[in-house]
From Swiss-Prot:
Residues 184-201 have a biased composition (Low complexity). Its EC number is 3.2.1.4. This is Endoglucanase-5. Residues 177-206 are annotated as: Disordered. The gene is egl5. Belongs to the glycosyl hydrolase 45 (cellulase K) family. CDD domains: DPBB_GH45_endoglucanase. InterPro entries: CBD_sf (IPR035971), Cellulose-bd_dom_fun (IPR000254), Expansin/allergen_DPBB_dom (IPR007112), Glyco_hydro_45 (IPR000334), RlpA-like_sf (IPR036908). PROSITE patterns: CBM1_1, CBM1_2, EXPANSIN_EG45, GLYCOSYL_HYDROL_F45. It comes from Hypocrea jecorina.
Amino acid sequence: MKATLVLGSLIVGAVSAYKATTTRYYDGQEGACGCGSSSGAFPWQLGIGNGVYTAAGSQALFDTAGASWCGAGCGKCYQLTSTGQAPCSSCGTGGAAGQSIIVMVTNLCPNNGNAQWCPVVGGTNQYGYSYHFDIMAQNEIFGDNVVVDFEPIACPGQAASDWGTCLCVGQQETDPTPVLGNDTGSTPPGSSPPATSSSPPSGGGQQTLYGQCGGAGWTGPTTCQAPGTCKVQNQWYSQCLP
């Protein structure tokens, strides 16, 4: 399993407190969210749009209650921002820091057979991270096994439309997946964590469009720059949307 993050267009958003490892895969199969058919995956799963992809999530992202089909995390989207670092010196080369993509969860990366990368709920993988995204791609996207900062976001319009073609729409489990803790993951040996700023974005204390504006533990701006409105996505995340 070789990791990949996408070199898509940069996406403006809030800095996330959560980190995950990434890899990439392509098996052409339907996946655990029912996106595809017995003959294979839907074509859009290789790339919904510019900078928007699909991924298999580790169990805590797919379903915290342990479901392996139609998990509560199916159809949810996340913004991934590259830290530029690989999880270890021998398991990837990393990539350019600061580049972002969006992924929609359409499959499960189970711990069984993938323990190196995909942890159980409440556990960590071999590199000390609690979350993992295995991005569906046939070629490298924006790095080689890059560690990312991630946060839940509203799915872009095309992703939401594509999700509507999957078998698991309306059939997902109902546990509050994902339950994001305070674990920010590990720092690769011999490296320093990326610098972050605690200052609110410019604009008189208002958040920029598509940035975070609320959610459990959020201490940043709660109003949005025009034309944005702060809209609740779930109990952990509210986002400035047009």
